Amino acid sequence: LRIPCCPVNLKRLLVVVVVVVLVVVVIVGALLMGL
C-alpha cells in the first residue's frame, strides 16, 4: 500500500474518519434508545 501524499492529508483524513464514526455511533445509540 503506497501513500504518495504527505502525512498532513493523512492526518486530516483520519480526523474526518473519526468524526464520521462518532456521528454514526451517536445516531445508532439514539435509535437504540428510541426503540
Curated annotation (Swiss-Prot):
Lipid-substituted positions (S-palmitoyl cysteine) = C5, C6
Matching entries from InterPro entries are given as:
SP-C_palmitoylation_site (IPR018051), Surfactant_protein_propep (IPR015091)
Q: Where in the cell is it found?
A: Secreted, Extracellular space, Surface film
Keyword vocabulary terms for this entry: Gaseous exchange, Lipoprotein, Palmitate, Secreted, Surface film
Q: Name one GO biological process term.
A: respiratory gaseous exchange by respiratory system
Q: Name one Pfam family in it.
A: SP_C-Propep
Superkingdom as given in the UniProt entry: Eukaryota
- Is the keyword Lipoprotein assigned to this protein? yes
Q: Which GO terms describe its cellular component?
A: extracellular region
Biological function: Pulmonary surfactant associated proteins promote alveolar stability by lowering the surface tension at the air-liquid interface in the peripheral air spaces.
Q: Beyond the main fields, what else does the record say?
A: Pulmonary surfactant consists of 90% lipid and 10% protein. There are 4 surfactant-associated proteins: 2 collagenous, carbohydrate-binding glycoproteins (SP-A and SP-D) and 2 small hydrophobic proteins (SP-B and SP-C).
- Kindly provide the name given to this protein in its UniProt entry: Surfactant protein C
**Lineage of this protein's species?**
Eukaryota, Metazoa, Chordata, Craniata, Vertebrata
Gene that codes for this? SFTPC
